[in-house]
Structure formats: C-alpha cells, structure tokens
Amino acid sequence: MSKKINKNPVLISIIGGSGYTGAELIRLISKHSYFQLNQVVANRNAGKKIQDIFPHLRHLKLPDFISFKQMNFDNVDLIFCALPHSTSQEIIVKIPKGIKIIDLSADFRLERIEEYERWYGSKHIAHSLQEE
C-alpha cells in the first residue's frame, strides 16, 4: 500500500523565534520539504530580518520577524511555541481554538496543575488548556 503524499506544505508559525530554540526551529523547518515557514514571532525584533539576528541563516529565504499582534491565524496549520515557561501559557490562551500547537516550554508538560506550580514555583493560568 502506498502512502499518499500531501503536495501542499504544512504552514508553520513559530512564536518565540529570536531565542536559541527558535533559531534551531527556523533552521530545521526551513530544510523540511513538507513544511513552509510563513510567520516567525519575536515581539522585540518585529520588523527585523531574521538573518540580521542570526547571520548563520543568511543563505535561507525567510520571512521577517513579526509581533504576536500581527499574526495571521488564517494562514497557519501548526504553531511551535518556543517561549520560556510561564510566558508560553499567557500567549497560547490567545490563539484561536483548532490550531495545532507544539509548546516547547514546561507550561503544559505536566498533567496536574498542582505539580506544575510546585515544580516551577509559579501559578498556571491556562487551566482549561491544560485539560486538553
């Protein structure tokens, strides 16, 4: 049985694209034949070229950084969130339901909110999302 190959790339957005993890995601996703990187959020660097922040990515064709407020949620299939823990949950609650999210922080790593608050020493504000 042959696998059906999707000719349309998966539209990827990264939130938190100006840190180390964001840079690695940009590098890896831009090389993947099934992915198209179309938005990279870095609020403090919005409007700047990714290649100006990460010179080692100069050879890649990349979008400029945008702010979270500039995100077009109609133009995304999957979001990678590369923000620090406790920052991630503040942003993820603002993303429309139905969009797939891979969060690389600790915010949704543990099943029970009590465990998160005990381990990380901060309140978890996204209780409804934790249940998903």
Question: Which residues are covered by each model-predicted region?
Answer:
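N-terminal Rossmann-like NAD(P) cofactor-binding subdomain of oxidoreductases
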Residues: 1-132
